[in-house]
């Protein structure tokens, strides 16, 4: 007997960030990034559309610069003194072999869309000089963007697309908008040299960017122009960035709620004004944990946010907040209700079935799956048995 049920195509992708930390060996490595890559490569054999990596694609090692036993005789000029790092200060060492190993650990059988985090845009500037390359005597040249250039080099001839901003359809029901969020940071001016390096390599613009406001304006115009070009309505809009809109974190033994960027909130509201009937999801990283919650902006735009900075970086402490408690950051138009907060490594599996979106966090440390909105039987083919699996609604 032939079934009259209409089959619904299922699309899915994997999302995480904050990952390339230390030497990666996906087969025998015991550090966090190796374990995540081992699991990811096995999981990527499933029928997924692509992998979204939300930045911080390499972490230089923080080390303390040893004090020299003897100082050179003679007085140095004030200008010379100011330009040097103070002895005993912490510096950041780029280990090229570790950076390369991480990119070689990524799955090679599926498209990877990779955005930039703040660590990818780090370089020595006139005001901040702390990056060294492979040796304590080799300081990175000013405005050299060694990390970014090395990452782009590793992506060449691989299945990796570096994305500063991109808008595309997962299906007729779901739109994905990948956004650069580092330009909304307070110290984003320090990233201008590497933004221009990226633009030059990719032939994006002819004239170098000179200020961050100009860059924010360019991104906003590109996104809104693409939305106008599409002229469609979507059941779901998934926005992907590096930084959370807001979220709970621990800092100096205090529980801190991240203050949102006003400029970024304005961009989100501009997107919302074009698609008010859509369901909104925001996937990001930056905090080294898995945190899920609901954000409401101006009592209009409701966003389900997933912070997934769990790809291999040293983990942050997951603070405890009263379940269901809604908090206002220092911005009256926004509220945040945290629902999940776990300090662990893993990645998020995002599944679309028809007009529904389901999220499954694959926790590799505890060997569990944390489910969000996955109540329908239509998502069962992506499930696996786990005695300790957790479920949230």
Give the residues covered by each predicted segment.
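Short acidic, glycine-rich surface-loop motifs adjacent to enzyme active sites
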Residues: 54, 230-250
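Conserved acidic residues
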Residues: 49-51, 235-237, 280
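Active-site glycine-centered loops adjacent to acidic/histidine catalytic or metal-binding residues
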Residues: 18, 55-56, 117-118, 179, ...
């Amino acid at each position: 007997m032939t079934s009259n049920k209409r089959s619904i195509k299922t699309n899915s992708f994997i999302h995480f960030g904050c990952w390339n930390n230390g030497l990666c060996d996906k087969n025998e490595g015991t550090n966090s990034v190796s374990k995540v890559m081992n699991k990811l490569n096995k999981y990527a054999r499933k029928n997924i559309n692509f992998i979204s990596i939300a930045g911080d694609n390499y972490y230089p090692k923080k080390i303390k610069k040893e004090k020299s036993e003897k100082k050179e005789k003679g007085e140095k000029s004030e200008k010379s003194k100011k330009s040097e790092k103070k002895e005993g200060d912490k510096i950041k060492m780029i280990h090229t072999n570790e950076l390369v190993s991480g990119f070689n650990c990524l799955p090679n059988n599926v498209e990877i869309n990779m955005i930039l985090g703040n660590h990818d845009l780090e370089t020595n500037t006139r005001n901040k000089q702390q990056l060294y390359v492979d040796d304590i005597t080799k300081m990175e040249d000013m405005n050299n963007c060694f990390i970014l250039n090395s990452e782009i080099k590793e992506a060449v001839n691989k299945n990796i697309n570096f994305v500063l901003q991109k808008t595309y359809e997962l299906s007729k029901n779901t739109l994905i908008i990948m956004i650069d969020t580092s330009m909304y940071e307070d110290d984003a001016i320090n990233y201008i040299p590497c933004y221009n390096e990226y633009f030059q390599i990719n032939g994006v613009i002819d004239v170098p960017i000179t200020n961050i406001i100009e860059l924010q304006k360019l991104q906003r115009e590109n996104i809104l122009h693409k939305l106008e070009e599409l002229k469609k309505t979507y059941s779901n809009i998934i926005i992907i960035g590096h930084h959370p809109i807001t979220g709970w974190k621990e800092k100096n033994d205090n529980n801190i709620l991240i203050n949102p960027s006003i400029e970024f909130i304005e961009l989100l509201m501009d997107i919302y004004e074009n698609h008010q009937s859509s369901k909104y999801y925001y996937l990001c990283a930056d905090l080294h944990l898995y945190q899920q919650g609901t954000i409401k902006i101006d009592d209009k735009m409701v966003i389900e946010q997933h912070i997934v900075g769990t790809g291999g970086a040293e983990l942050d402490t997951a603070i405890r907040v009263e379940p269901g408690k809604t908090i206002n950051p220092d911005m009256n138009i926004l509220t945040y209700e945290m629902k999940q907060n776990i300090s662990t490594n893993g990645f998020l599996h995002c599944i679309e079935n028809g007009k529904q979106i389901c999220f499954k966090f694959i926790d590799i440390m505890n060997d569990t799956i944390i489910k969000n909105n996955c109540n329908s039987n239509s998502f069962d083919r992506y499930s696996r048995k786990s005695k300790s699996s957790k479920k949230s609604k």
